[in-house]
């Protein structure tokens, strides 16, 4: 069995050359990155007891970035001292990520693979599932595979979209058709998942919830902030028991 959806992989492969163009098709992710990094550091610092203001605060931690794309999260995590493995089902994405890391003298272990194919049981302190679960083919298998790769007491961050009318209006109609922030067809609303449903799936896999936050975009300041509003974007932080 596989978690790969070939249509989804082809979709992102076609855009691979634009990963590091801050005004290109991945501009929304570039805008998203600061709040994602801030949140990961906040939760991880409390869990692993380190100081955020340390420029190498993630030193000694092994991180798996699933669906790493061109390396937008892998690179800052590496700069903060983590030992990062980035995997993606698109060979083109991995090629772009490797080239960009080399250009910036960053040592990142990039692999063209999927979590169910990695033979690395209990290997990682942190797993990053950022804007990935809404694109996989078999969510249950995907989450099971992630659980096996994470160390006991390790953290997993899952960022995705809630399955609500608001998310359909904002994330699909608004972002894809009206504002054209994303190419039409980037998201399939049927693959969005409610936070409580995701929590239940992870609870069944022996995870416990550490934190849940919404993420909302402020159009005036053109930035993302944490929010109590879970109706569209949210991040769920969980610990493997």
Regions found by a protein language model. Give the residues of each.
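Acceptor-substrate binding/catalytic loop of class I
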Residues: 160, 180-197
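Conserved alpha-helix/loop element of class I SAM-dependent methyltransferases that forms part
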Residues: 31-59
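Conserved hydrophobic residues forming the short capping helix/wall of the S-adenosyl-L-methionine
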Residues: 44, 101, 202
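Short, flexible, mixed-charge acidic loops at enzyme active sites
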Residues: 167-177
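N-terminal, positively charged/glycine-rich alpha-helical extensions of SAM-dependent methyltransferases
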Residues: 1-26
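Conserved SAM-binding loop
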Residues: 50-56, 61-167, 195-198, 236-240
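Core SAM-dependent methyltransferase catalytic element
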Residues: 223-241
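Short alpha-helix
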Residues: 189-206, 212
């Amino acid at each position: 069995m596989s978690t790969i959806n070939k249509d989804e992989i082809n979709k992102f492969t076609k855009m691979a050359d634009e990963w590091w163009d801050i005004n290109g098709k991945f501009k929304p992710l570039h805008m998203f990155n600061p709040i994602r990094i801030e949140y990961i550091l906040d939760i991880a610092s409390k869990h692993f007891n380190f100081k955020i203001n340390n420029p190498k605060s993630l030193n000694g931690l092994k991180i798996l970035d699933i669906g790493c794309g061109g390396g937008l999260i892998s690179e800052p995590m590496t700069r903060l001292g983590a030992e990062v493995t980035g995997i993606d089902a698109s060979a083109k994405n991995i090629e772009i990520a490797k080239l960009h890391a080399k250009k910036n003298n960053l040592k990142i272990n990039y692999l063209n693979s999927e979590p169910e194919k990695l033979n690395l049981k209990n290997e990682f302190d942190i797993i990053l599932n950022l804007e990935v679960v809404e694109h996989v083919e078999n969510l249950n298998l995907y989450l099971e595979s992630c659980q096996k790769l994470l160390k006991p007491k390790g953290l997993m961050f899952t960022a995705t979209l809630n399955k609500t009318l608001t998310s359909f209006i904002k994330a699909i109609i608004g972002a894809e058709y009206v504002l054209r922030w994303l190419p039409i067809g980037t998201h399939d609303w049927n693959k969005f998942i409610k936070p409580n449903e995701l929590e239940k799936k992870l609870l069944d896999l022996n995870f416990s919830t550490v934190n849940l936050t919404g993420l909302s975009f402020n159009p005036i300041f053109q930035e993302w902030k944490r929010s109590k509003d879970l109706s569209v974007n949210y991040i769920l932080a969980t610990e493997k028991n």
